[in-house]
Swiss-Prot record:
Presence of the UniProt keyword Protein transport in the record: yes
Annotated spans, Disordered: 24-72
Localisation: Cell outer membrane
Main location: membrane
Name of the protein this chain belongs to: Outer membrane transporter CdiB-2
């Protein structure tokens, strides 16, 4: 018998081996697709957290102008004259361009509010002191709206006619220019104003903010008088460092399945076209080089350019992973990839000393597949398009800063996109309709001589549809509800998480100790029953930065633990995390 087996042909041995290697079952395919979705969700969480941090840390320019008194009370004087009519006109001696800028005959004209302000005093008996108070009050009202070089004068006149005539001298921009005439680049993409426009402080603030977005560029401004009445030059003093930045970081934000240690490196180029634009490209890779059974990597890039009150940003990123997947009698190799292209257009709608309100439109294309043993899993295929409209706001309450956004997001059939194969049966869909809310409040305060800062962050979404895992709210990681190891997440089509953190700066060391308490909840029509819907966790840690002549270094070290979790939810009792960053 042994002799017979010894002479079996090679083809027979191959057949026996192939029979022993079973094909992946539908359950194996579902597990592989889920693993891919979890990896992509982790990468998406990291990007979302970075985007929220960038929003909160974005430069803001605020200028102090005196608050106007609503309507000064006029004194009783002798002599005084009853004034029934007010005239606010630009003197004929000024250029035609200045006269056009100062027009206020129509309700939507720039200075129409000034005429309405004057009308408050119609019918009152006004003397010399009253005229002075009116001119001062109107000047403050104009100044409060940002017209810091516009003036109001009183020409010679006879008040006994019952009319008070005032002269409006519009403050116009003669030139916007660099202090250093040899400086390369332009201010025109950053500033919403041009030569001959009325000088408004809010326009200047917008331009300065757009130039300060470039991290290696700092800008200050002064106003120099021109030759004609009301004319001024806006002179920009620009200080620039090296136009490139390399950032490298390492952390343990990954999972055991695809590499706990993660490394990132990026190159940022400031002003590549001299348009106050920004270009950045980065690469991430797991650092578990000793084990070739699993891994993850990806790259990302974005380009952003301003145009006055507009900002356009084009982003692209990929995520790829592979890992062993244990089946009943054998182990398969599961892998997947995701590619995303995103275009975002932002517009500042209004701005004041304490508030900047904007709108955004965003178009996203997403492609992805999951594989098991190199074979595509049809149910995991993604070719989706999303359109988003939203409002965003930054508001200052004293020393506190609030950043918030409210957006409507919808999946569409544009650009050749297809829906999920489960959508026809009422399952998960990429054609969902969703509302997304983000908010962050940072409040510094002092007890005795010790400064503190309280930071609270909220993220939530609501939809009436069943969405894919990648489009769900997930909780249980360092980017959402802290205190959990991130190996297992709770996910739902609807949900929110709320993070709270108290920071305590340590003297002048650049180090801050912090403690946090987070809570999250998810729910919705999910295809798989959840072990629970709520998580709460606590964290303590230290973070800070250090500047040297060789570069800047940052660190964040923390330990967290669950406060509440469902009984069937697996996680470590204590999770220790870190992130180290170097910038050159």
């Amino acid at each position: 018998m042994a002799t017979r087996f010894a002479i079996l042909p090679v083809t027979a041995l191959i057949t026996l081996t192939a029979q022993a290697q079973q094909a992946p079952t539908p359950n194996d395919q579902a597990a592989a697709a889920r693993a891919n979705a979890e990896q992509n969700q982790q990468a998406q969480q990291r990007r979302d957290a970075q985007q929220r941090d960038a929003t909160v840390q974005a430069p803001g320019v605020r200028s102090d102008v005196p608050r106007p008194e609503a309507y000064p009370v006029l004194p009783t004087e002798t002599p005084c004259f009853q004034i029934d009519r007010f005239a606010l006109d630009v003197p004929d001696s000024l250029p035609a361009a200045s006269k056009a800028q100062g027009a206020s005959a129509l309700p939507m004209d720039r200075f129409a509010f000034a005429r309405d302000w004057l009308a408050h005093y119609a019918g009152q008996c006004i003397g010399k002191q009253g005229v002075d108070l009116i001119v001062k009050g109107l000047s403050q009202a104009i100044l409060a709206r940002g017209y810091i070089t516009t003036r109001v004068l009183v020409p010679e006149q006879d008040l006994s006619t019952g009319a008070l005539k005032l002269a409006l001298i519009p403050g116009v921009i003669r030139h916007v220019r660099f202090e250093d005439e040899k400086l390369l680049g332009t201010w025109k993409t950053a500033f919403p104003t041009r030569d001959g426009d009325v000088l408004n402080l809010r326009d200047i603030e917008q331009g300065l903010e757009q130039m300060k977005r470039v991290s290696s560029q700092d800008v200050s401004m002064r106003i120099a008088p021109g030759d004609m009445p009301g004319e001024s030059d806006v002179v920009l003093d620009v200080k620039r460092g090296k136009p490139w930045t390399v950032v490298a970081s390492i952390d343990n934000s990954g999972t055991r399945a695809t590499g706990k240690l993660q490394g990132n490196v990026s190159l940022g180029i400031d002003n590549p076209l001299g348009l106050n634009d920004i270009f950045n490209v980065g690469f991430n890779q797991d650092l578990e080089f000793g084990d070739k059974r699993f891994g993850s990597h990806g790259w990302n890039a974005f380009y952003s350019i301003p145009w006055g009150y507009w900002t356009g940003t084009l982003s692209a990123y990929t995520s790829t992973y592979f890992q062993p997947l244990a089946a009943v009698n054998q182990t398969f190799v599961a892998s997947g990839n995701m590619k995303t292209v995103d275009f975002r257009l932002n517009r500042v709608l209004t701005r004041s000393r304490n508030d900047v309100l904007g709108a955004q439109v965003r178009l996203t294309r997403r492609f992805g597949d999951s594989y098991i043993e190199g074979t595509t899993i049809p149910s995991s295929h993604q070719n989706a398009t999303f359109l988003e409209f939203g409002l965003n706001d930054r508001h200052y309450f004293g020393s506190s800063q609030f950043d918030g956004s409210l957006a409507y997001r919808q999946g569409l059939g544009w650009l050749g996109s297809t829906d999920s194969m489960f959508a026809a049966e009422g399952g998960q869909t990429y054609r969902f309709k969703m509302v997304v809310l983000d908010a962050n409040l940072s409040t510094p305060f002092v007890i005795g001589t010790q400064p503190f800062k309280y930071v609270t962050t909220f993220h939530g979404q609501y939809t009436g549809n069943t969405v894919s895992y990648l489009d769900s709210v997930t909780i249980g990681s360092r980017y959402t509800v802290r205190g959990f190891d991130g190996e297992t997440l709770l996910a739902g089509s609807r949900g929110f998480y709320w993070r709270n953190e108290l920071q305590v700066p340590v003297a002048q060391t650049g180090l801050s100790a912090y403690a946090g308490l987070d809570y999250g909840r998810v729910w919705g029509p999910e295809p798989v029953a959840l072990v629970g819907t709520q998580l709460a966790g606590a964290v303590i840690g230290v973070k800070g930065s250090l500047m040297t002549r060789f570069g800047g270094y940052g660190y964040d070290l923390f330990a967290g633990t669950p406060v509440y979790k469902p009984s069937g939810f697996p996680t470590a009792r204590v999770t220790v995390g870190f992130q180290l960053t170097a910038q050159f």
